[in-house]
Each structure stands twice: as structure tokens, then as C-alpha cells.
């Protein structure tokens, strides 16, 4: 009897395919009041499992604490400003107030969402143009997006840009990195599996076997191109 497919095991909902408790137990965003003006001091720089970039803990002048993504070059006891037109490293400003050409990160896609774009280690975006009520931002992928002027962003580039310079060397190290973030790894092709693991597996009878599967196929056989009208490139003419 064959084994269950990967999608069957994931759909069951076991701990092996669930988020680890405590992985994202730290809130990393901006203050909810978009009109608030604060001044804070960096009290601690630390790493967290749920983020590739280092984080910084900030103590504000109203005696509250918060966490934000740390920029390259920040250090403990540095001042960080929120809502003020003070363009210092790590400060939070409206993108409509930031001069063109300045590097930014942790950008809000809609005003008040706390930052959704450009958050990974070493990434940075640039303010390229100011339009009527909107701002053009160039992302690390070189794609341009037009965002509301009231969206906020931090100044600088995300720290930790050299995290991928050191090679992994062995598969075991990659194993722990992937499992910390609940990535599906390793992901192998069905034709490289054993016959007991996948309908496309095995060395025999691989040639000429269709990858198309009926819509009414039972679980365990329903893999490949399900009820496809065609496969491959479209024929000309």
C-alpha cells in the first residue's frame, strides 16, 4: 500500500506542519496613531527567530516601549524620531515628507498598517518621485509602486545584509534554518520519489506516463495536471 502524499500529510494538521509556538511573539510595527510625534532611544539590539533582520527595542519619551526593524549603522543610545520631519537613521516619517533619493525600508502599503514592504535583511527602497498626493517608491526588485503620501517608512537600509554571505556548507544547517521558519523543505519532484511515495515515482514505466489526472481521481492519486484541457506549449496555427 502506498504512503500518503505530502499534501495529505499537510492537510491533516499535525505539529510537523504547524507554526512553532512563540516564533512571532514580538510585535514589530509603528504606533497605531499615525498623527503621533514621539522621540525614543534605542535600548537594545537583538535577533529574533521570526525575522531575518536584527530588531531594536526603543524606549519612548512617554515611557512606553516598542520594537522596530534595525537599520544598518544604528547603535544603542541613538535617538529615533517618529512623526517628526527629522531625517535621522531609523526614524519614521511620512513618505510624502521624505526627500527624493533617500533610502527607506519597512514601508506601509496603506496608512496605519504598521509596515508591510521591504522588511528583510539587507533590503532597501528609494523615494524616486513625489506626485499629487502620492509618492513613487522603487523597491529592491526595481519595480515601482505609487503609495499614499500618508504612508510611513523608516530611513536607511535594513541591517543584516551579509547574512547570506557565509555558505551553509551542509544540509543539516539548512534543515534547522528552514524548520525555524516553517518552510516546506526539502521539496522534491514526484518523478524522483519511490513508487510507494508518489504515483509518478519509480524507475520503471516513467517514460510516456501522462501527468494528467481525472477530476474524479481518489485522494492519493490526484496529483499532476488535474482535469487539464492541455499541457505544454500552445500549438501554433
Predicted regions and their residues:
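Basic, glycine/proline-rich low-complexity segments that contact nucleic acids
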Residues: 1-51, 76-237
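Short N-terminal amphipathic alpha-helices
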Residues: 54-56, 69-70
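Short, hydrophobic/aromatic-rich beta-strand segments within well-structured domains
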Residues: 56-57, 135
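Beta-strand/loop nucleic-acid-binding surfaces
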Residues: 63-75
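Short acidic-glycine loop/turn motifs at beta-strand connectors
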Residues: 60-63, 141
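Conserved strand-loop elements at the edges of beta-sheets that form or border functional pockets
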Residues: 60, 70, 129
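Structural recognition of beta-strand segments within beta-rich domains
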Residues: 50-52, 58-60
Amino acid at each position: 500500500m502506498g504512503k500518503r502524499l505530502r499534501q495529505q500529510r499537510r492537510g491533516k494538521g499535525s505539529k510537523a506542519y504547524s507554526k512553532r509556538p512563540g516564533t512571532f511573539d514580538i510585535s514589530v510595527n509603528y504606533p497605531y496613531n499615525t498623527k503621533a510625534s514621539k522621540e525614543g532611544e534605542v535600548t537594545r539590539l537583538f535577533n529574533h527567530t521570526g525575522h531575518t533582520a536584527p530588531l531594536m527595542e526603543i524606549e519612548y519619551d512617554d515611557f512606553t516601549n516598542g520594537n522596530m526593524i534595525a537599520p544598518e549603522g544604528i547603535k544603542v543610545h541613538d535617538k529615533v524620531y517618529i512623526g517628526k520631519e527629522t531625517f535621522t537613521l531609523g526614524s519614521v516619517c511620512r513618505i510624502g515628507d521624505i526627500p527624493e533619493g533617500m533610502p527607506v525600508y519597512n514601508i506601509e502599503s496603506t496608512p496605519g498598517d504598521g509596515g508591510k514592504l521591504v522588511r528583510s535583511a539587507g533590503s532597501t527602497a528609494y523615494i524616486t518621485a513625489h506626485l499629487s498626493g502620492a509618492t513613487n517608491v522603487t523597491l529592491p526588485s526595481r519595480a515601482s509602486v505609487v503609495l499614499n503620501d500618508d504612508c510611513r517608512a523608516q530611513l536607511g537600509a535594513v541591517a543584516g545584509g551579509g547574512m547570506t554571505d557565509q555558505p551553509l556548507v551542509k544540509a543539516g544547517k539548512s534543515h534547522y534554518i528552514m524548520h525555524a521558519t516553517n518552510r516546506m523543505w526539502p521539496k522534491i519532484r514526484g518523478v524522483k520519489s519511490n513508487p510507494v511515495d508518489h504515483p509518478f515515482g519509480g524507475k520503471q514505466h516513467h517514460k510516456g506516463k501522462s501527468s494528467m489526472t481525472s477530476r474524479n481521481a481518489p485522494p492519493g492519486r490526484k496529483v499532476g495536471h488535474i482535469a487539464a484541457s492541455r499541457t505544454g506549449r500552445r500549438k501554433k496555427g
